[in-house]
């Protein structure tokens, strides 16, 4: 019994092997026939046609096949066509064979496919390799031209563009007069045609003369038809023809009626679905409105993303001369195309509305696999985090080789664990309106880039940590957690800070110290003339100490700190140890659960310097996270050794000056309001200016300050702040204004200070410090400041005038000296703010609008130009203007009929084709426009996008 089974099994295998040999023999016999060149067939079929591979799985849509029949016969089937209940709307099949064909009379291309239904994707059959099969491939080098009347005349010739002739035809011998050669080309049917290629005329051009008229007559070509020349992978020169779509003037020669053809298509598919047998279909790519044999992978990818009403999409269409263009639109409905015959069918179940109208017909209903959505491509606008956003001026991402933009919104520090949190401001000039705009833009930001982490935030971190506001009675709830330090320590702190900075010279310094001391002893008293006793005692204690004077030097990273509180985690010490005296403020603590720390700092000489504050009359002391490295200021001679000392008697005052004036608009000031956290550990990145020549420090710092300001402020804010009409005194309290007037009246000769504050050292740890100020939560008011941390800027009223007695004359200098900063939107200002929106204690004059910048237009070999894209209403006007600028009239206005292309770089560094995006979005995100010649277009398609980047860098 077993032997008989083995014999039967062996016989089956022998028969299967014989059958396979016979199939291969048949394939070789079929292969003996001339096979149509796949590249030429695809060139004639169109750039969007892609046939499935043999043996692959596809979905066959009978509904789409019926559309092809209707398009071929130009007749819609009537209601007498029967329904086939057992025929599903889509049929999973395996491709057994594909054969390429071309009509001998018209050269119309079509494909014959043999399909076999399968139950699932696992039910596939092994397909033997037949010699007649060739893989589908598109040509890489081709030229297509729509024939004109002169091209089809019997006595004329065929004009070939110079670039196409030089690329496809053999090189001419220009030593001949005139240069000419004989071309031998083959068509779809392997027929040979001979043309004479000559270079003549005025101006000279490439022409096909002898033999061309014979070809036009034999093919019955008319104006509007297209001719294609390609060079295949074997370097053979091939010739194809495309017929223009014309109205049918005569009845079809087919003996079958339109209804019979529809019935035949549906009946064959229904029989195959029920029996599982193979069936044959014919696909005409030039006639069929849409392909109806879809690869399973393409179908699954499209249906994985569930479509929804309002979804944005794009779809590729073939335009003139075998070019492609992407059109965008919106899904406006989802419903069955033919609910009676094909319920629940995915064929054309999307109702769409196109952004542009005209320039060819586009269907009102499409299938999900025919479109590109934001989820499966990065070219189109998306509603996700990677969406195209309104580009806020000054926050663009740099394009390689183009000096456009210098900062990124992702560099703004945010709360730890909440990188997408909203930004919070510290009260300063224009901060409320700036934050409103930045929050609107920041809501769609992606994850911050590590290499864009701002180093400015590290500097602000150290600057802000120097400042501890005095606590009022309303903050007594938080003072229970704080430790009190002896008053002797406070005096020692005051002494060490003054020893560090040197003695103060001149009688005019004494009233300043008096006013500062008084403001610290009595928060309710604003009179700086009642503190002589305290100042004298402080000065005498300073002189009684025997520690040496002078500045201490430290490395750029500083030395570790010793803390008083176990909770404090101190940062590195700066090069200057400043006095942490503070101006009395009327402040109240909002929801403060953190303990404000004040640490001890041990300098390189071993002397322990305590940074504390003289707080309220009750003597409450607070702890400080770090201290401030003071800026370079004008110096005077100390009476003991002629050493250069700072002009400011109190560096805490200068910290306020930094907070209130020059640093008030830095990116690090915008903090996260969702999570209140204490400042974390930070590495000091200050270096002592004693090691660097003063001139170098001043130049470096002025450049650094200008770059900081240019990074964080839009144009309208900068022009508002830097306006000559906006005087610094308007931001001071009435006491300060009176003090300034008094100083000018007395003729006090006050030394001027440099706007350069610190020597910035880009340490490795600076990138991680930008989120350390997330504990700040301040709200700007006119006379009070609410704070939950150890920072307080001078932005509005509610501060003492004594701290400004040593500042330069504010009327003689502006708050900010900003260079003109161009917006990154290249032609439009995305910042829609007005100076009149600022709520200030003055009547601000209406400001003139910011100077509009222009978009660069570049072309290889030509001088770049600038253009205002907002001055145009649509793409056509823009193309016409650019064409006139570079003498390319007629080459840019119609992208479908020209080999010249216009591309642009947006602020996300994406290179897109001009015309893909809606006009309003284009003018807001364009950074640079580039004109690509046909050779550059071809080179880019071969070598990738780095070719365009190289061109941009070279320009």
From Swiss-Prot:
It is found in: Nucleus. Residues 551-560 have a biased composition (Basic residues). PROSITE patterns: B3 (PS50863), PB1 (PS51745). Expressed in roots, culms, leaves and young panicles. Residues 518-573, 609-646 are annotated as: Disordered. InterPro entries: ARF_dom (IPR010525), ARF_plant (IPR044835), AUX/IAA_dom (IPR033389), B3_DNA-bd (IPR003340), DNA-bd_pseudobarrel_sf (IPR015300), PB1-like (IPR053793). Its main location: nucleus. Residues 143-245 bind DNA. Residues 852-936 form the PB1 domain. Residues 518-543 have a biased composition (Polar residues). One of its GO terms (molecular function) is transcription cis-regulatory region binding. GO terms for cellular component: nucleus. Auxin response factors (ARFs) are transcriptional factors that bind specifically to the DNA sequence 5'-TGTCTC-3' found in the auxin-responsive promoter elements (AuxREs). Interactions between auxin response factors (ARFs) and Aux/IAA proteins occur through their C-terminal dimerization domains III and IV. Homodimers and heterodimers. Belongs to the ARF family. This is Auxin response factor 11. The gene is ARF11.
């Amino acid at each position: 019994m077993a032997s008989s089974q083995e014999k039967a099994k062996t016989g089956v295998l022998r028969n299967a092997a014989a059958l396979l040999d016979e199939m291969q023999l048949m394939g070789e016999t079929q292969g003996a026939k001339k096979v149509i060149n796949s590249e030429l067939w695809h060139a004639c079929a169109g750039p969007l046609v892609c046939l499935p591979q043999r043996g692959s799985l596809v979905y066959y849509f009978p509904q789409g096949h019926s559309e092809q029949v209707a398009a071929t016969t130009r007749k819609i089937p009537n209601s007498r066509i029967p329904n086939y209940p057992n025929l599903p709307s889509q049929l999973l099949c395996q491709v057994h064979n594909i054969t390429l064909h071309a009509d001998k009379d018209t050269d119309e291309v079509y494909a014959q496919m043999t399909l076999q239904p399968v139950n699932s994707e696992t039910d596939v059959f092994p397909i033997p390799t037949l010699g007649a099969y060739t893989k589908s491939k598109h040509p890489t080098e081709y030229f297509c031209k729509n024939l004109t009347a002169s091209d089809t005349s019997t006595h004329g010739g065929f004009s070939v563009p110079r670039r196409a002739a030089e690329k496809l035809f053999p090189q001419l011998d220009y030593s001949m007069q005139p240069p000419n050669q004989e071309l031998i080309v083959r068509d779809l049917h392997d027929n040979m045609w001979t043309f004479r290629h000559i270079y003549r005329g005025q101006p000279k051009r490439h022409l096909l003369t002898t033999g061309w008229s014979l070809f036009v007559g034999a093919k019955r070509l008319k104006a509007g038809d297209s001719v294609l020349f390609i060079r295949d992978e074997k370097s053979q020169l091939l010739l194809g023809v495309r017929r223009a779509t014309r109205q049918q003037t005569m009845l079809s020669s087919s003996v079958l009626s339109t209804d019979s053809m529809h019935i035949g298509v549906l009946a064959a598919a229904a029989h195959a679905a029920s029996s599982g047998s193979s069936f044959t279909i014919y696909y005409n790519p030039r006639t069929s409105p849409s392909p109806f044999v879809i690869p399973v992978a393409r179908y699954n990818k499209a249906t994985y993303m569930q479509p929804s009403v309002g979804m944005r999409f794009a779809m590729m269409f073939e335009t003139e001369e075998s070019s492609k263009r992407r059109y965008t639109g919106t899904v406006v409905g989802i419903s069955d195309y033919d609910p009676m015959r094909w319920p629940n069918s995915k064929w054309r179940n999307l109702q769409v509305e196109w952004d542009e109208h005209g320039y060819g017909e586009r269907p009102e209903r499409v299938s999900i696999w025919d479109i590109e959505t934001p989820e499966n491509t990065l070219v189109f606008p998306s509603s996700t985090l990677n969406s195209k956003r309104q580009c806020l001026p000054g926050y663009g991402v740099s394009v390689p080789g183009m000096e456009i933009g210098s900062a990124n919104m992702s560099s703004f520090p945010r709360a730890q664990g909440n990188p997408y949190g909203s930004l919070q401001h510290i009260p300063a000039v224009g901060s409320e309106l700036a934050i409103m705009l930045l929050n609107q833009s920041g809501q769609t930001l992606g994850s911050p880039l590590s290499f864009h982490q701002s180093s400015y935030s590290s500097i602000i971190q150290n600057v802000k940590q120097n400042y501890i506001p005095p606590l009022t009675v309303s903050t007594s709830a938080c003072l229970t957690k704080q430790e009190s330090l002896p008053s002797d320590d406070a005096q020692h702190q005051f002494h060490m800070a003054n020893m560090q900075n040197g003695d103060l010279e001149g009688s005019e310094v004494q009233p300043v110290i008096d006013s500062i001391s008084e403001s610290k002893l009595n928060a309710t008293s604003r009179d700086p003339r009642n503190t002589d006793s305290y100042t004298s005692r402080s000065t005498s204690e300073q002189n009684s100490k025997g520690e040496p004077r002078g500045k201490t030097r430290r490395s750029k990273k500083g030395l570790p700190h010793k803390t008083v509180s176990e909770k404090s985690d101190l940062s590195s010490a700066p090069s200057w140890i400043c006095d942490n005296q503070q101006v009395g403020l009327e402040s109240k603590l909002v929801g403060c659960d953190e303990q404000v720390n004040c640490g001890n700092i041990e300098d390189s000489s071993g002397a322990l310097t305590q940074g504390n504050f003289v707080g309220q009359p009750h003597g409450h002391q607070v702890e400080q996270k770090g201290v401030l490295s003071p800026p370079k200021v004008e110096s005077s001679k100390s009476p003991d050794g002629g050493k250069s000392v700072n002009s400011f008697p109190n560096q805490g005052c200068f910290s306020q000056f930094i907070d209130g004036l020059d640093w008030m608009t830095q990116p690090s000031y915008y903090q996260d309001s969702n999570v209140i956290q204490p400042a974390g550990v930070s590495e000091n990145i200050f270096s002592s200016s004693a090691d660097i020549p003063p001139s170098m420090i001043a130049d470096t710092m002025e450049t650094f300050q200008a770059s900081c300001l240019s990074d964080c402020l839009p144009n309208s804010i900068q022009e508002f702040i830097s306006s000559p009409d906006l005087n610094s005194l308007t931001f001071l309290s009435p006491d300060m204004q009176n003090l300034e007037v008094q100083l000018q009246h007395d003729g006090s000769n006050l030394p001027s200070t440099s706007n350069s504050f610190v020597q910035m050292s880009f340490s490795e740890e600076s990138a991680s410090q930008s989120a350390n100020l997330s504990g700040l939560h301040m709200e700007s008011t006119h006379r009070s400041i609410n704070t939950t941390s150890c920072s307080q800027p001078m932005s509005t009223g509610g501060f003492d005038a004594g701290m400004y007695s040593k500042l330069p004359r504010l009327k003689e200098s502006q708050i900010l000296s900003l260079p003109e900063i161009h917006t990154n939107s290249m032609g439009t200002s995305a910042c829609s703010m007005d100076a009149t929106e600022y709520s200030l204690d003055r009547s601000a004059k209406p400001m003139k609008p910011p100077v509009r910048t222009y978009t660069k237009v570049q072309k290889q070999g030509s001088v770049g130009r600038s253009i205002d894209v907002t001055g145009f209403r649509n793409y056509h006007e823009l193309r016409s203007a650019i064409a006139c600028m570079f003498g390319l009239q007629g080459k840019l206005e119609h992208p479908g009929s020209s080999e010249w292309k216009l591309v642009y770089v947006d602020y996300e560094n994406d290179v897109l084709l001009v015309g893909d995006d809606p006009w309003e979005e284009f003018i807001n995100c364009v950074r640079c426009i580039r004109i690509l010649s046909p050779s550059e277009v071809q080179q880019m398609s071969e070598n990738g996008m780095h070719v365009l980047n190289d061109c941009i860098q070279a320009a």
